[in-house]
UniProtKB/Swiss-Prot annotation:
One of its GO terms (molecular function) is ubiquitin protein ligase activity. The E3 ubiquitin-protein ligase activity is stimulated by PEX12. The keyword Protein biosynthesis does not apply. It is a multi-pass membrane protein. Its EC number is 2.3.2.27. It comes from the Eukaryota. This is Peroxisome biogenesis factor 10. It comes from Schizosaccharomyces pombe (strain 972 / ATCC 24843) (Fission yeast). InterPro entries: PEX2/10 (IPR025654), Znf_RING (IPR001841), Znf_RING/FYVE/PHD (IPR013083), Znf_RING_CS (IPR017907). A zinc finger (RING-type) spans 256-294.
Length: 306
């Protein structure tokens, strides 16, 4: 089979969009299985799994497509190949796709743990920067480390989206691949269709598509950011790790069943269960029910505890 090195970057975008839709479908099925396990088991199960659902969904989808093309590759008419010194362009082997999958899995897991550390740091009153980093930063910056972590955590979705777009643009235009692991392994996408070499780089269209992603992310985050700060302006920053705050709450109920951390800004549903404000607000925005007893609960009925 003769393979041509030409490819339209828009084919890679189409491939990633379709693959992402498939991954989101698998993610929704995982959440459905968790709901079918019963309310209490569901809350405990999702409390541990929620940060890893995206990683698990991506791993399951990619693992099922190791020996075959993904849905995105089929639709975009592209294949994953590698440059061989003697044979030229050859199709990527199952082993190479497996290695790429493992690399991507490790990178995603590191990202999840960094995300958890940022969240814990923004909530913890005793958070300190690592010793090595404290030595590198000016004293004025160190004195405001808690505020820096809070700002970084608040605008993290926009920063991640911006980094993701820049990374994807560089990989697509220069490496003809979609992930860092593919670039490290020398894998790249090639088109099964004839591409005019002079028109294969539609930079303007590519920038418009990726720019629209960033704008959508900024608008979405701005709405949630202002919503959170409207609420935070009328609440104090209570953390139930301190037993002196809201002492009437039993010690066994001072951890959120959704994030499995000490409850931050405690809020109660109509049925009386207590969670972090951000956790239960996000939950009821998607499912109008209590995570523990499945009683009806809407975001407008959540009660902030003072």
């Amino acid at each position: 089979m003769h393979l041509s090195a030409h490819i339209d970057p828009l084919q890679i975008i189409l491939c990633t969009e379709i693959d992402e839709a498939c991954i989101q479908f698998i993610k929704s099925q995982i959440e459905g299985i968790a709901r079918a396990c019963g309310p209490r088991m569901q809350a405990n199960f999702e409390g541990v799994l929620i940060p890893y659902v995206d990683v698990l969904g991506k791993f399951l989808y990619r693992a099922c497509c190791l020996r075959y093309a993904t849905m995105g590759e089929e639709a975009a008419r592209i294949v994953l190949a590698k440059q061989d010194r003697s044979k030229g362009l050859v199709l990527a082997t199952t082993g190479e796709r497996m290695t790429s999958l493992i690399f991507s899995l490790v990178i995603d897991l590191v990202g999840v743990h960094v995300n958890k550390l940022l969240k814990q740091a923004s909530y913890s009153s005793s958070f300190k920067l690592p010793f090595g980093l404290r030595n590198l930063l000016p004293e004025a910056v160190i004195s405001k480390e808690k505020h820096l972590v809070y700002i970084l955590n608040s605008f993290k979705p926009i920063l991640l989206k911006l980094v993701s777009i820049i990374r994807f643009l560089c990989l697509t235009m220069k490496g003809h691949c979609a992930t860092v692991s593919q670039l490290l392994l020398g894998l790249k996408y090639i088109s099964l269709d004839e591409i005019n070499p002079e028109e294969k780089k539609k930079v303007l269209t590519l920038l418009l598509l990726l720019g629209s992603r960033l704008i959508a992310s900024i608008l979405q985050h701005s709405n949630s950011y202002f919503d959170q700060h409207t609420i935070s302006s009328i609440t104090d920053e209570r953390d139930l790790e301190d037993k002196n705050k809201l002492p009437f709450i039993p010690e066994g109920n001072r951890k959120c069943s959704l994030c499995m951390e000490f409850i931050h800004c405690p809020a109660a549903t109509e049925c009386g269960h207590i969670f972090c404000w951000s956790c239960i607000n996000g939950w009821t925005s998607k499912k109008s029910e209590c995570p523990l007893c499945r009683a009806f609960s809407s975001p407008s009925k959540i009660i902030l505890l003072r």
